[in-house]
Amino acid sequence: MTAITLQDITIHAVVEQQGPFFDVKEFFPTLTKEQFDENRAWLQPTFIDANGGVILCVQSFLIKTPRHNILIDSCVGNHKPRPTRPFWNMMDSDRFEKGLVAAGVTVGDIDYVMCTHLHGDHVGWNTRLENGRWVATFPKAKYVMADRELAYWTQKENDDPSGFPWITDSVLPIVDAKRAQIVKSDFVLNESIQFIPTPGHRIDHYSVLVGRPGHDASITGDMIHSPIQGKYPELGMRADYDSRQAGQTRRKVFDRFCDTSTVMCVVHFPSPSTGRVRPWGDGYKFVA
């Protein structure tokens, strides 16, 4: 994606990987054959490959303002044991760090890491392995997490310490080091960085509204994974906490930004991952 300029703010994509990680029927369990066939022509090959794999990007968005460098989500990370996800298991890649450098920053320049939610592909670079310990990757950053989301996963990890490795290696070390800033999902950092509560995919998910009216962008997190969920906003995906609520959230957000100049920066859309919301029948589409 080409950097987006919003007056004195720029947004850069920092891509870790992209590929067809899940079968479309597995990823969207309620997607009907009729719905898929009706939309196959525009979905393939950009969003779904010839074998039915949903093409997803795993990336962060870097926001550069006059005052702060802010990273939204932190991908999968290196050396993280993810045995149920072979494409993420024990990664050892310099692509993410090179992406930061290409955008003009290093890990030491990041002031905030904002975790839209605490799934493993959004928190991985929170930490890095150093002498057998998980330490903060971004040495001066505050890590911003929604309070109910953190409480939910902390309890899960307490109940089953081996069952949620991304919490063990990428979230709790940040909390234990007192680097976490725990907030409500309607948190406002300043006049140009504010959260939008977007629950459903997670119990306490947030998106990030960047910029000022008429010159703004919404960084979605996992409010949406594929543009087929624009066409069918009620279409849930396999990892939703509450698919019904997620569908209601999508409609509410798309209604808010439809036919406006707001740029949607969608974490999991294949590159370039951005578009503006426009009406499309009973749903919505994304246009450049």
Residue map of PLM features:
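Active-site metal-binding loops of divalent metal-dependent hydrolases
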Residues: E16-Q17, S74-G77, L118, R148-E149, ...
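Active-site glycine- and acidic-residue-rich loops that bind
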Residues: V123-W125, Q194-Y206
